């Protein structure tokens, strides 16, 4: 057989071949010997020998892909080591794939290129020979000059960095994977460090092991660890080119006991073929553990000024916290000369050291080391005794010259407690030089008694009591312990009579007692609380509003239109009384055209009120006239300031204060009753729509009896005489008022309003009711803020509830016994509601609208805790103040939605400027209520301001038709007759009693007698007042027209007001 030629024959005989994607192609190589192939991807080959002796090898690809792109070479197997150019035949096959424009690399680290500053190859080969390829530097995003060969890639000299090839095929841009050119190959060797964040862990913790390698940039890492079979670890790589190091991190989440073992990291330098392995032990415990080995005994002693150390070894995981106590007080609060330290011996072992730098006597005591580890806590204790030499603090004669004997007290101290011995010397002249003259004192003889005790400073007081002394003698006190022995002497003079000293002492004692008594009386008088109105009008004196002054209420004008004839006011039962005054239920006649008889609340001072308190009440009246009317404040209706005590007449709120209401309805809130299917629909004020045309905007007087407010309740048997109205003319039978509103046209959402603002209190209490209360209070406070008025005592006890579930803000401090009210804390000569006050009010005496916002947040807490006391279980002391300063805030009440609690927390912001305004608060609450609530509220408020409510008419009317009482022009009287007022009669057998100034309440029994003899009482009262010309004593047959005429006659009498308070 002839020797084969130098190279076989490859068919087809082309340099390159383009094969469409997913089509088949075949290459054939024939020669005179056995043939081998070098192909980019393994493909099946078929070899056969024909009759002529030629070897024919065929490779076939059924579905071509981009991975088949590359050189296909055939050669004689025996010539594999010969020159490639002569021994091989080759063809380059392209398989264009639009989804794979660049041929993927199959060689490990094929995208890593070593920079040797010679021509390099970045093998970003394309699958489509028509592609236009540009090399881009990723770091600069700039093209890199190079020569590109579609069969080899980008050719050139490249600096270290990251590169990418951009190919454009048919107008579309494609990018290859990143190619990394390494500029450093590493030092002379390979260095590996293996560390772990924690080598001891608990089940569930995360194991983190770091393997830091320094060598070339082409390194391989290989890990061995207990959980490798389960492939539990996560590996990450971070390259630090600046320091020429690579960090490999192995992370095992949710470690278990099975992850305990050896963790091994092996690093191989691909360039130098060097490798290095490091190991570390990791231990995972199933649970926490802790043990203490004290290096001291239960009892220890130290000498004075000695440096002492007491050690205890602690084994714990996780890390334990160690605290030392002395006599149950943390050592950090005892002295700076006692130090504690904690030394870490290993990840689970520590040494705690207690050091007494210079032991002192007060360092004696019980020392306790408490070690806490999670839920585990253990303690070890030692009792330390610092030995102190015995000393005599004092030696004194207490009863020198007493006729009943003399007493000598020797005060000693030392550790251990000194032993005290007594000696006497009767020969005074030789006591100093002759030790034999001193003899021990017999214990508890007939002439001498001894006693000893420890005083508050833990000193030992030893007392010797001598009977009658005939001669002067010297007494020695000797104190000794194991550290020292000391003695002191004192001379006792024999007993003798000294009557002049006795008399002088008695006079001196009496004088001291008198002086002390006077001082106590003065202090008590100065500390007696004085009445002051909490509401204040402020005026800003700085551009930013941070500085302000209080406007003196006495400088505000008083409009005499508010004056109401005293004889038109009948006082009834006492609603509440306090340290300064009282609030009395009253009936006013002629306040309004639509309600000629109206139940009101009357504020007055006690008869013993000082002039400053009268001035304060007048200030309150002027502030209320300054504010004007609003739906959600207790409005001023009138005042009596002339010819008698000052009376402030306000709206009467039947359901009392909000706290009591929430308490009484707590059960209905917690256990709501099922709705009755046949319940009548009510409008938002609880008025039957069928009767709406005959009812006023809001009923201001009631015949039934209810609690009024949470204050010191007066004796129920005490009454101020009040007009009796017969059963035939009760309030419920009176005709409708003249400020009726037209019947409402109810929509589909009014059912929600029925429950929110219904007057049917049996319906129960809902979360929407609570939101309604908070919204109305916010609107009321928004109104006060618009008037520059600061409330300073905003709380649920100062919010009253009237018909239709309308809440009204008030200040009933006058009639509240604040000296015995736990909500008020004594500070100087006043009592403050500290738990409702903002920090700047408590600590800086700063009151603004923003401090009222803080109080509003406390009010929200009260409402949604259903009348709970703020900061439950906490007393107002230094600890309370410190907690407020440090940012303590109350947790969310049980019934508060999260949105409401978020609003509370905003109100309690320690920085006042960051608290919300009352306008913002009302908008926020409105968003939590049914959509139609705000519309209903605005309609009611509009009707209130358009009505002839007394609080509105006195502000709006400034013409001749204004009325005081019922003072109408003739056309007004005609109009009253036409509307049926002349049909309203008072009972013929009911007397009208003119109230005496500051008349003491009467008992129920006396009140009943007066009712039975009303006519007689009326006459007597009229005589006592001395005002027969203005007495409104209604006779049988009198009509309201007659009452009106009397009013007009008396109108001129009401122009004078006490000038001293105006």
From Swiss-Prot:
Glycosylation: residue positions: 79, 132, 273, 333, 366, 433, 444
Domain Protein kinase: 569-945
E.C. number(s) listed in UniProt: 2.7.10.1
Membrane topology per record: Single-pass type I membrane protein
Role noted for this protein: Tyrosine-protein kinase that acts as a cell-surface receptor for pdgfa, pdgfb and pdgfc and plays an essential role in the regulation of embryonic development, cell proliferation, survival and chemotaxis. Depending on the context, promotes or inhibits cell proliferation and cell migration. Plays an important role in the differentiation of bone marrow-derived mesenchymal stem cells. Required for normal skeleton development. Required for normal development of the gastrointestinal tract. Plays a role in cell migration and chemotaxis in wound healing.
UniProt topological domain (Cytoplasmic) ranges: 526-1062
Modified positions (Phosphotyrosine) in chain numbering: 548, 550, 697, 708, 719, 731, 739, 824, 963, 992
Protein name per Swiss-Prot or TrEMBL: Platelet-derived growth factor receptor alpha
Naturally occurring in which organism (per UniProt): Takifugu rubripes
Keywords: ATP-binding, Cell membrane, Chemotaxis, Developmental protein, Disulfide bond, Glycoprotein, Immunoglobulin domain, Kinase, Membrane, Nucleotide-binding, Phosphoprotein, Receptor, Repeat, Signal, Transferase, Transmembrane, Transmembrane helix, Tyrosine-protein kinase, Ubl conjugation
Active site residues according to the UniProt entry: 793
Stored PANTHER family: PLATELET-DERIVED GROWTH FACTOR RECEPTOR ALPHA, TYROSINE-PROTEIN KINASE RECEPTOR
Disulfide bonds: 29-74, 124-165, 211-265, 410-477
One GO biological process term: chemotaxis
Post-translational note: Ubiquitinated, leading to its degradation.
